[in-house]
Amino acid sequence: MAKKSQIAKNKRPAKFSTQEYTRCERCGRPHSVYRKFKLCRVCLRDLAHKGQIPGMKKASW
């Protein structure tokens, strides 16, 4: 879980575009965040298994 100060800092607009980085909207994790969903891989997998992300299902081939 991200610190409250980091979450507040991330919500502020950055002065330069290079200062912006993705962070999970649900848990605040900074790594392996899918831009399309704004979720980290852990949260994305959890929500997909629960069926809360429309159109996403487990792949099998």
UniProtKB/Swiss-Prot annotation:
InterPro entries linked to this entry: Ribosomal_uS14 (IPR001209), Ribosomal_uS14_bact (IPR023053), Ribosomal_uS14_CS (IPR018271), Ribosomal_uS14_sf (IPR043140)
Gene Ontology biological process terms in this record: translation
Annotated keywords: Metal-binding, Ribonucleoprotein, Ribosomal protein, RNA-binding, rRNA-binding, Zinc
Protein origin, superkingdom: Bacteria
Any one annotated GO CC term: small ribosomal subunit
Keyword Metal-binding: yes
Binding site for Zn(2+): 24, 27, 40, 43
Cofactor binding annotation: Binds 1 zinc ion per subunit.
Keyword field contains Lipid metabolism: no
Cofactors required: Zn(2+)
GO molecular function term, any single one: structural constituent of ribosome
Pfam families: Ribosomal_S14 (PF00253)
Family label: Belongs to the universal ribosomal protein uS14 family. Zinc-binding uS14 subfamily.
Oligomer status and interactors: Part of the 30S ribosomal subunit. Contacts proteins S3 and S10.
HAMAP family, sorted: Ribosomal_uS14_2_B
Biological role stated in the UniProt entry: Binds 16S rRNA, required for the assembly of 30S particles and may also be responsible for determining the conformation of the 16S rRNA at the A site.
PANTHER family attached to this UniProt entry: 30S RIBOSOMAL PROTEIN S14, SMALL RIBOSOMAL SUBUNIT PROTEIN US14B
UniProt name for this protein: Small ribosomal subunit protein uS14B
UniProt source species: Ligilactobacillus salivarius (strain UCC118)
Taxonomic path: Bacteria, Bacillati, Bacillota, Bacilli, Lactobacillales
Gene name linked to the record: rpsZ
